Amino acid sequence: MSDYIVVKCGGSMLDQLNDLFFDCIKKLQQKYKVVIVHGGGPEIDAQLKDCNINAEKRDGLRVTPKEVMDVVQMVLCGSTNKKLVMNLQKHNLRAVGCSGCDGNLLQVQPVSEEIGYVGEVRYVETALLKGLINMNYIPVIAPVGINDNEIYNINADTAAAGIAAALSAKELIFITDVDGVLHEGKLVKKTDEFEIVNFIENGVITGGMIPKVQAALASLKMGVQKVSIVNGTKDFTEVTGECIGTTVTRGVSIA
């Protein structure tokens, strides 16, 4: 069991996770070393609304001035992270929650001054993750990072991709509420980056699936071997550890 798997669970999925999801994590853990990265967008938006703070996005990134960063940190590192950790432990999965600023885990480069405290992963302190895994814990990572002793918000997809690339992970799994990419009503089980681009250009992939496959393509460019898009409300893992969904690679052949 030497290969790493990174599982990215979006904030909109956290309240939909059922027993099947946790059973799938158990199956993955029998074959691989598992790391989970989570989002928290809906809860952040709700908290910002309660605080009468404007929520704004540019090019898919949350504009994060200081007052927004305080809320992002409170939600991601606090309630959202701990809720997922407790849920894993309730299903007899040993988990430790931490954020990207703990132990300098995720060191970031600021994206631009115009969008505030938003960073891109430039370095991952993998020794911390490996240490937790070697003690049979699943690291559960809140996507915030650190630069010059300041905390930055990180897009959860790119945080997961950065961690997967740093660990030379065998696979990055995006947990969604759909079965994967559909073509003429049928699930596309295996594809590559060139076919995905063609699907987007020809309108096969539309709506909410576009950002998911774009995140998959970005992950491949960062060095991840393969990316799977799966339905987290269903059994998405074979007993072999293979995913049931759409698997995207840089080439048509899947190792």
Swiss-Prot record:
Similarity comment: Belongs to the acetylglutamate kinase family. ArgB subfamily.
Lineage summary: Bacteria, Bacillati, Bacillota, Bacilli, Bacillales
Keyword Cytoplasm: yes
CC annotations in GO: cytoplasm
Enzyme Commission code(s) on record: 2.7.2.8
Keywords: Amino-acid biosynthesis, Arginine biosynthesis, ATP-binding, Cytoplasm, Kinase, Nucleotide-binding, Transferase
The keyword Disulfide bond appears for this protein: no
Name of the protein described by the UniProt record: Acetylglutamate kinase
Organism expressing this protein natively: Bacillus cereus (strain AH187)
Function: Catalyzes the ATP-dependent phosphorylation of N-acetyl-L-glutamate.
Catalytic activity: N-acetyl-L-glutamate + ATP = N-acetyl-L-glutamyl 5-phosphate + ADP
Any GO molecular function: acetylglutamate kinase activity
Pathway assigned to this chain's UniProt record: Amino-acid biosynthesis; L-arginine biosynthesis; N(2)-acetyl-L-ornithine from L-glutamate: step 2/4
Subcellular location, record wording: Cytoplasm
